[in-house]
């Protein structure tokens, strides 16, 4: 079976917890919305931090709202550029992942773990998941079209009331397919 869905390309970014927000931006500081992104209630903020490793540094935009735990999401290319061995993980699975120094306008901290390469995944409204016989935790494929059409395997389904229909891949994967955010791709699966 297959069905079309919009693609969202995720560039490197950071999610901060309240404690780290206070250290990096000042006590009780708030994020300021730069622009909404594809998932309900989420946004790219005006705020940025600098991640520093022994090898290099890079700027990271903060995605809001704040989360229970700080998580940095990089592409494999980004991780290699700064010399990190960041594991490919599902969002939230940060145990024993990479760490680095984070610097903000009000302070800095040493993040012990929390840096990952986010595994590709598809967000689905509950109604969409039900319509196609899928559930949270299922694994599907993404099929892309065009000159550099590819099939990407092992795509995690994340279905629930806090999700909107959208596939998320990182910049490395999007560049391999020569695709940008907003194009349609197909979810392919066997039921």
Q: Locations of the language-model features?
A:
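RNA-contacting regions in translation and RNA-metabolism proteins
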Residues: 186
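Extreme N-terminal starter segment of soluble prokaryotic enzymes
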Residues: 2-4
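Short coil-to-beta-strand transition motifs
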Residues: 149-151
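Short beta-strand-centered segments at strand-helix junctions
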Residues: 6-8, 13-53, 60-105, 110-137, ...
